[in-house]
A protein has these predicted regions:
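Short, surface-exposed acidic
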Residues: 21-26, 67-69, 127, 146, ...
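Catalytic-face loop-and-helix region of soluble metabolic enzyme cores
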Residues: 82
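An extracytoplasmic/periplasmic, membrane-proximal ligand-sensing/linker region
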Residues: 86, 90-161
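Stable alpha-helical elements in mature extracytoplasmic
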Residues: 6, 10, 37, 52-56, ...
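Sec/Tat-exported extracytoplasmic proteins
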Residues: 17-18, 32, 45, 60-63, ...
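Bilobed "Venus flytrap"/periplasmic-binding protein-like clamshell domains
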Residues: 1-48, 54, 121
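Short beta-strand->loop
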Residues: 24-27, 60-78
Length: 161
């Protein structure tokens, strides 16, 4: 219930569409991982599921799911990867050197695109050490709607089998 791309965002998107998952869904299964959600969809055990699109594409490429049999209903706006943070007491010069290194790693001799990875080991084309903190505001606001009360209601519904 704390996964951004397989729980918080999909639940928030349902809520944005006027759907209360705990009230409006006949049954809820908390599958536990993106791969489990995709497997449940592929096997017809669930009608809908939330997972990262990266995981869906990976499953399609691996032949784990037939895209002709599963329809993508919606995709969220891009979700920022978790930030890499540094302690504010670091000397300014060191902070700038670190930012510069991350911003230019994709141009570093000997570094290939396959070596640049983000959250969960997913390939990224580059890092952006200048991403403003305010860029996290909209995603944080969206996820805040899925509060402890909403989570508790969904967990309770999932336990009613």
């Amino acid at each position: 219930v704390n996964s951004t791309s397989s729980f918080l965002y999909p639940v928030a998107m349902l809520m944005d569409a006027g759907i209360d998952p705990a009230r409006d869904m006949k049954q809820i299964i908390l599958a536990g991982s993106h791969a489990n959600v995709i497997t449940a969809l592929a096997e017809g055990r669930v009608d809908i599921g939330g997972a990262s699109f990266d995981s869906f594409e990976k499953a399609v490429k691996a032949g784990s799911i037939d895209p002709a049999k599963v329809r993508v209903l919606a995709k969220s706006e891009p979700i920022p990867y978790p930030p890499i943070a540094m302690h504010p007491a670091l000397p300014s010069k060191v902070q700038q050197q670190l930012k510069g290194a991350f911003n230019s790693v994709h141009e570093t001799p000997g570094i290939t695109p396959d070596q640049i990875r983000g959250y969960g080991g997913h390939k990224v084309d580059r890092y952006d050490a200048n991403f403003p903190e305010s860029g996290m505001d909209a995603p944080a606001k969206k996820m805040t709607r899925v509060n402890d009360q909403v989570k508790a209601a969904i967990i309770k519904k999932a336990s009613d089998r």
